[in-house]
């Protein structure tokens, strides 16, 4: 009888650092990585490329079921590359327009259902680190370790501003804060899989912590629960 691989979930709002933390954890553990938020960004990005309206639930469902996507673990500073239809779109899907589109398509029940099975397929040996907004509540509710990572909205906006500036993209801090606040409200109030911590999740506020400090805290939990084998 085969033993089911372990999955660790990391949920949280936009800009909390969950994607970077998940990528570094997966690299440290030698496990698979699922960036579920990227799946919704990829869908919004692909929809625009293929001329699919973001309100056309049926067409988006079909597109979601056939997304040709790969997550490739790379360097410490950039824990993963995201490949869509053979093209590296890691940076292309990280702008605010694609993020808004991702939040829009994520509110559609048929889209979430189409992507649910795709997310389950990432759970393969030796283990999986899955980050998103409903990993611990909907996608992997039986995960033995669930983390809900957050930070104050002002700090999340500052991080995003710094990230954009380092990438050579013009950004406005107050506009970013407004966009993050709107997205928080939209994600937490949507009818399907709203953003919330699982009852048994460990809640970490990363406002005053470095990425490495967050990773070490989670690694301590993994060791305490003997999840890494």
UniProtKB/Swiss-Prot annotation:
Protein name: Cytidylate kinase
Entries under CDD domains matching the protein: CMPK (cd02020)
Primary localization class, coarse: cytoplasm
Catalytic activity: CMP + ATP = CDP + ADP; dCMP + ATP = dCDP + ADP
Subcellular location: Cytoplasm
Keyword ATP-binding among record annotations: yes
GO cellular component: cytosol
SUPFAM superfamilies: P-loop containing nucleoside triphosphate hydrolases (SSF52540)
Classification lineage: Bacteria, Pseudomonadati, Pseudomonadota, Gammaproteobacteria, Pseudomonadales
Binding site for ATP: 12-20
Molecular function terms from GO: ATP binding; CMP kinase activity; dCMP kinase activity
Organism per entry: Azotobacter vinelandii (strain DJ / ATCC BAA-1303)
Keyword Nucleotide-binding assigned: yes
GO biological process terms held by the UniProt record: nucleobase-containing small molecule interconversion; pyrimidine nucleotide metabolic process
Pfam families: Cytidylate_kin
Keyword field: ATP-binding, Cytoplasm, Kinase, Nucleotide-binding, Transferase
């Amino acid at each position: 009888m085969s033993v089911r691989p372990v999955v660790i979930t990391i949920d949280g709002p936009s800009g909390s650092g969950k994607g970077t933390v998940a990528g570094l954890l997966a690299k440290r553990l030698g496990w698979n990585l699922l960036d579920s938020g990227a799946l919704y960004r990829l869908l919004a990005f692909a929809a625009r490329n293929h001329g699919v309206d973001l309100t056309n639930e049926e067409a988006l469902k079909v597109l979601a079921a056939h997304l040709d996507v790969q997550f490739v673990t790379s360097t410490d500073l950039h824990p993963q590359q995201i490949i869509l239809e053979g093209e590296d779109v890691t940076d292309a899907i990280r702008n605010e327009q694609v993020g808004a589109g991702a939040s829009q398509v994520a509110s559609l029940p048929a889209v979430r259902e189409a992507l649910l099975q795709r997310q389950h397929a990432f759970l393969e040996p030796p283990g999986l680190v899955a980050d998103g907004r409903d990993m611990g509540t909907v996608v992997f509710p039986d995960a033995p370790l669930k983390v809900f990572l957050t930070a104050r909205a002002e700090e999340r906006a500052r991080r995003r501003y710094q990230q954009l500036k380092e990438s050579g993209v013009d950004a406005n801090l107050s506009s970013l804060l407004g966009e993050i606040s709107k997205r928080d409200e939209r994600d937490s109030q949507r009818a399907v899989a709203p953003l919330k911590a699982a009852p048994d999740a460990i809640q970490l506020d990363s406002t005053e912590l470095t990425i490495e400090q967050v990773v070490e805290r989670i690694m301590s939990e993994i060791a305490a629960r003997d999840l890494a084998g």
